[in-house]
Amino acid sequence: RWADIIVAARPGVGKALALDTPLPTPTGWTTTGDVAVGDELLGADGKPTRVVAATEVLLGRPCYEVEFSDGTVIVADAAHQWLTETRASRKSAQAAAAGYNRYKNQRTFAAVRTTAEIAGTLRCPTLDRRLNHSVVNARALDLPDREFLVPPYTLGAWLGDGTSAAAQITAADPEIIMRIEAEMSSTVGTLQARLRTIGVLGNKHIPTEYLRGSETQRRELLAGLLDTDGTVTAGGAVQFSVTNQRLACDVAELIVSLGYRCQTSTKRVRGRNESSSIAYTLTFSTEKKMFALERKAIHKERRAMAGTTRSGSRFIVDVRPVETVAVRCVEVDNGSHLYLASRAMVPTHNSTLGLDFLRSCSIKHRMASVIFSLEMSKSEIVMRLLSAEAKIKLADMRSGRMSDEDWTRLARRMSEISEAPLYIDDSPNLTMMEIRAKARRLRQKADLRLVVVDYLQLMSSGKKVESRQLEVSEFSRQLKLLAKELEVPVVAISQLNRGPEQRTDKKPMLSDLRESGSLEQDADMVILLNRPDAFERDDPRGGEADFILAKHRNGPTKTVTVAHQLHLSRFANMAR
């Protein structure tokens, strides 16, 4: 029988950051308070990622200051999620790299944890009480080449050792001078005129467009800075010192944008005035070649890294409760759901029931189904399906750290999964007209028996409309007509507003359906998802989820309790 079914849940259950948290973008910076749906942020993989959902401002939530080993402090709510490694997972990763992770205690890897969970396990339960959680550095920003008036290396050399008010470079090293002359020989106009045009003459700083150049261009810029004013420590770390605070901040951003952890220290020096009496020293570690100047590159190689510093990640050194502040949630469209936050560019985190419907229809009962996914990519959906069917942790699949037992389970399920009549369409900006046309073709071609749309709030009509509520109402009516025309169930995933969070019991109601009351009116069935342990980690019903059948046009309403196995991307019946 055909039916129009709405499945609704809260978006992310409140993974929120303070409104003033800086967020890097492909063109500069924004904040959690200013970012809007459709804007681009940067993911942990260094690539631009689009904001697909952003909540209203949330008040009265328990908040924490999360402090990292490089001095970065981020204010987040208790439910905000971080992808962290623990002492156990770091040992497991080392075992995996060495090829002997065959034991259960060597199969724990990085996992998503809330701020509250990290606060409770901040230090290891060992005699030395060492720090437990670390966050792996983001990859170097992956951005396109730009056209620059001043070549990046030349700008870096001038910023490091040039006269602020003129185009004079005081470096005596002939290798640097020869490279600058070679770069400027093919340009028209003087270096001084070009420095004035980009706004740095008399005001030393790195223009934003240079900080968002390609990785190669940013490495050339940093090489110019280090060749003129960089040093190497006894342990092989790279240092850059300057008394210009703005330039120090810009160079720190440049270093972080290349995927390195940057530590900043200060000390008093004898300067001409107060503003030049503080020296800022930036320190970072890498095995890569950072100097273009041959003698410095050789010197760094000679002072090889001692290997005692964990330079690929930041440790969380403290998680302390603070007074509640206004916070906001952001959701991005990349597969890992990670985006960068703060000036240090720390990676931070951001639907399972719809996939359970598909698995039951196509894999268990061999009937054709289709999901039109506006949120997740095809590869992400397939990975979640494999995780759920083979009962393998999604985090292990993503990281490529599956055990021999995991591979065996996956191999056993692959033939059945690969033969399932399951169709996935992750086309961007799908309209209702396109969904109807594709669903009709599948009905004729493969005897389609189920349609899932994930999710309604990401759909667009492609037309100018008077209000978003009217647009969602039209989607609701069109889905109803589609279900009736094809005579198949149409399951539409929807978001709830933040109403449940204001109630004592946190349970969702029909009135919480987001952006349109038409969803409630048009649907034959509405299922609301509720997870008691989403707000209270120590809730006695931890691990349970409620499917609240809030509307059923042709039958009774009821609440069904199931077990959530989110690490396996699935819900399961409760054990009896």
UniProtKB/Swiss-Prot annotation:
Disulfide bonds: none annotated. Residues 154-260 form the DOD-type homing endonuclease domain. PROSITE patterns: INTEIN_ENDONUCLEASE, SF4_HELICASE. InterPro entries: DNA_helicase_DnaB-like_C (IPR007694), Hint_dom_sf (IPR036844), Homing_endonucl (IPR027434), INTEIN (IPR006142), Intein_endonuc_central (IPR004042), LAGLIDADG_dom (IPR004860), P-loop_NTPase (IPR027417). The keyword Isomerase applies. The keyword Transport does not apply. This protein undergoes a protein self splicing that involves a post-translational excision of the intervening region (intein) followed by peptide ligation. GO terms for molecular function: ATP binding; ATP hydrolysis activity; DNA binding; DNA helicase activity; endonuclease activity. Pfam families: DnaB_C (PF03796), LAGLIDADG_3 (PF14528). Its EC number is 5.6.2.3, 3.1.-.-. Keywords: ATP-binding, Autocatalytic cleavage, DNA replication, DNA-binding, Helicase, Hydrolase, Isomerase, Nucleotide-binding, Primosome, Protein splicing. GO terms for biological process: DNA replication, synthesis of primer; intein-mediated protein splicing. One of its GO terms (cellular component) is cytosol. Residues 313-576 form the SF4 helicase domain. Belongs to the helicase family. DnaB subfamily. The main replicative DNA helicase, it participates in initiation and elongation during chromosome replication. Travels ahead of the DNA replisome, separating dsDNA into templates for DNA synthesis. A processive ATP-dependent 5'-3' DNA helicase it has DNA-dependent ATPase activity. Homohexamer. This is Replicative DNA helicase DnaB. It comes from Mycobacterium intracellulare. The gene is dnaB.
